[in-house]
Amino acid sequence: MEDEVILELRDSDCEEGGAAVHAAAMEREDWIPLLLARKCKVFLRASRVILSERSSYFRSLFSNFREAHSDHVVVTWNLEVLANILQGILFERLDVAPCSVADLLEGATFFGCDSIISECQVWIASDMLSCSRDNQDVLQYVPRLWKVATETGVPTIASACARYLAINFEDAGSGEFLENIPLLLFQAAVNHPFLTISSERNLFQAILRRCRFETRDCALELISKVRMHWVPVDFLAAQSDNSLLNSHNRDLPLEPPEIKSAGLRLSQYTKILNLTGCQQVTDVILFDSVLCSPIKVEGEYILHSFLNSSSRYSNSSAAGPFLNHLVSLYPLQEERTQFELMQLPSVSEEVNKPDRSGIPLLNSLRILLLGKCWRVRPEELFLWIKTTCSSLQQLNVSQCPQFSAFFLSHLASACPFIEVADFSRDLSVIHLATVKKPCTGKLLTTSYKKGSWDTHRYLVELHLTGHTELKDSELSLISKKCPSISAISLSGCSNLSDSGIAKFLQGHPKLRFLRAAITAFGFQSVCALLAASDQECNLEVLDLAYCTGLSAGALVRLLTRISSFLSLSLCYTNLIDDGLFLSCGTSLETLNIRGTQVTGAAISYTIRKNFKLTSLNFRDCRGAFSYEGLKEEKLDLRRLKAGWGVAHILANAKLPFLQTLHLGLGAQITSTFLRELPSRCPQLQHLSLSLQDLLDDDLNHAIAKLPFLTTLKLRHTLQPLSGKFLESLTSNLVSLKLEDVCPSLTNAQLASIATSCKGLRQLSLTACRCLDSGALSIISKAWPALSELKLEDCGEATREGAAVLLCLYGLQSLTLRHNGAGLPRNFIMDASYQFPLLRCLSLDSCDTSGHFNTPQDGDWRSISTIKIAHCRHVPSAFCLEGRGRRVHRQTEVMERGGTTLRTFIVKERL
């Protein structure tokens, strides 16, 4: 035919002389093999008219060049892409995929196929953007697609790429290809209104990673986009030596920001909101952030600028119409709840419609993490959840003492699809002590009314660790209203009885996860658990640590009946050998039998029987000392904590995968073992040695050859060390604890540690009596991101006070005892306001004049436990001061649990 032309398609990636395939006609059934053929040349016959109509390249070629009079035309391009383009030209059919759309767009632009470009735009707008967070593979092709769209002048596709990257920024920021994202695309995503991240911390980290090789001005411009008020304080403190952050001149967010500041970054695509450690978050900020976010309402993307700026920051005592509307919709108490700190803005009448059609919704939000957010009040959080994110599936308010277990009663109506709820608190320390005076309770705040309780049909995992106020009647109600629970943590719920726990277990026979450490778990609970096992027991995790009410016989019955355990903790219980010998399980991966009566023979038998065992703890098991059969066991452990009998295991063992090694009393490690430790355990990350006979040279040799070591803990060595081994510490170290090890440690040596270990997060020094007040300055300047600090019997460290430590904003645990009587009486109050994340504070009355002032009802803020030790002076002929030596008398312990405050007097120094 006259209008036909033979096209010779040459693959630009093939060498000359490659194999060819001939196609006599372009029939549809021949096209699929043609696409799949990996040939260097393809000859085919096509219509000259159709090519000219649908491609400006061919139209020009057939009009103005010699090919206009030739029946043979050579076209060189990537053969697979060109075949797809010709399919679109001749058959108006395209095969578009994430991996090929960039090449297709580039080819379509070159060949002038506007229809194909339009189809690419449609596919990107519909298929690619619709898969947003579901198709992770698409992300790796976005940078090239953006580059091609920018170079070929297709701004709609370039903007679509920026939007897609913004929506999936969380996945891109954690991927390996972050550095391959073009800077302009990265900037466009960061500035996009639909930027979706779970935490500002993740955005900050991604910017720091991406801008390592960019100019300073560029990095600062991007860092300015981070909403620093929602970056956890401890993370910001860790970045204090970052020159970029210092140049940005940002103050640490210790208090809630002004309401006019930028709110939380929310979008309609937000699935996870992680505010853990952002103690400055309040319930008002949660509401305000939703109102000011670009969220889809009634089919349109709008920025909620309907807020009345003139009345937005009104000091009126009455709540705005929006709040009144919410309270009228969801009354939580008989009297309507009002915000006390700040008032929400007034909003337009459209938002206040009874049908709530104008209220922004976070329909995609599934996980809400509010750990350590002690300023968020339960009543207002309930309103926020019910109004904006009723599809929530996971809620974490751990380390938030203001939340009690009965917040669950409101969650049932606020988010009926909740699956995981975490209300964990710190475990009480009282179980470790002998109580001299009984607990006295005091109501801190008026709790909200419990009200009616709908059934949680989907709740499968519940964490109530540390809820000492939880009663049997309340646990029984939880059991009735949460019938689907398969995982629960009741550790530290000391107010529960054995019968109360047993009743709960009877109602949940399909538990797979049970933590009941430090409870009254006893014979009745064992019987209930075994009754459930008669059906079909799937219990995989069981923690009964410190459950002293369990008899040896009850433990034997338990272990002989349940075979599904993967993790088992029975430390400091009445476990005996029969429990391990008669155990029917063979799938244990984690076993903790510390402080029990088992012998080495039983431990050896258990190791042989459970070949998947990766974590073993048998410290303080004195019966393991004399059994040499342990030396024959082959171990594939990741974590080993041991004392008596461990010498037999470590005699000739190589543990190439061991990451954690804790050796205590009875371990009897030798100098040879310590020197060979790096070759035996090359992956070691955590090393703890207690009550061992150590030498500086041996420690120095071992530490220097452990490149992955992050934790070093030395306690009560049999002879004092000079501290020479400290020269081998590296920048990888995160935790350093020297307790009664280096009495001669000086400020100069501490400064040397500060130089080599800049990333410390935990520091504990005990009996370092040569330190003075200069040590506090070294600590505060060297490690601003410390989360745990303990100084006990450290010379005169606090003789001049401890005000210099008040810049350690990330502290969560602080112990200062017998370091010099320079602490002011109001130190506890100062600490509660200066350390926004502080949970545990331990002091000694010897370090102040008189007694410490304790917080009033409303001043506890984030603190959950205060321990104040008291001493008495015993006359001594060797003491020249006349007062005698100090001897511990008792410890006053104040624990905040929910809305109550408990006070104990115990014998031990806790």
Predicted regions and their residues:
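Alpha-helical scaffold in the C-terminal half of BTB/POZ domains
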Residues: 44, 82-83, 90, 96-366, ...
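Short active-site loop/helix that positions an aromatic residue
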Residues: 50-62
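Beta-strand elements of modular eukaryotic interaction domains
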Residues: 10, 32-41, 62-64, 73, ...
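Eukaryotic helix-linker segments that join adjacent hydrophobic helices
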Residues: 76-85
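Interdomain boundary/hinge elements
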Residues: 64-76, 133-138
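C-terminal capping region of solenoid repeat domains
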Residues: 268-270, 275-276, 283-284, 290-365, ...
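N-terminal BTB/POZ boundary and linker segment
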Residues: 1-48, 87-99, 151
